[in-house]
Amino acid sequence: MIKLYNFKTRGLGVITTEALTKGFFIGSYMKKNINQSSNSRLIYNGWVETNPLGRYINHNRNPNTFIKEIGDSLNLISSQKLDAYSELTINYLDVAKILKIPQSRLKELGVDDYDYIEEEIDKVINLI
């Protein structure tokens, strides 16, 4: 369903190997396994390792996936219909907000577009 792909201009990312419908479940991670130190890894690498490929999902301000939190599970869901061989993207700042990562920690990681977090997070919350 997904595989690692080396984009010549952007490096590694994850693509679909088949078409996915809007709302398609891609993978999940148990939130209880995320501790403070792995939070920074999540933001740095993107998505937590739902499988070995999950960490390569790239950031995009207009992502085609989102996180749906159900109990202790963080589920990666397609937010739109995707053609086969589409790159999967996630908004790292939305993930940071869901995990309640402090702005000070984001700043240490070089993420400083806080106004964007506040403007865009409502869109994700409405999808969940």
Kindly give the residue locations of the regions a language model identified.
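Conserved catalytic SET/PR domain of SAM-dependent protein methyltransferases, capturing the structural core
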Residues: 1-128
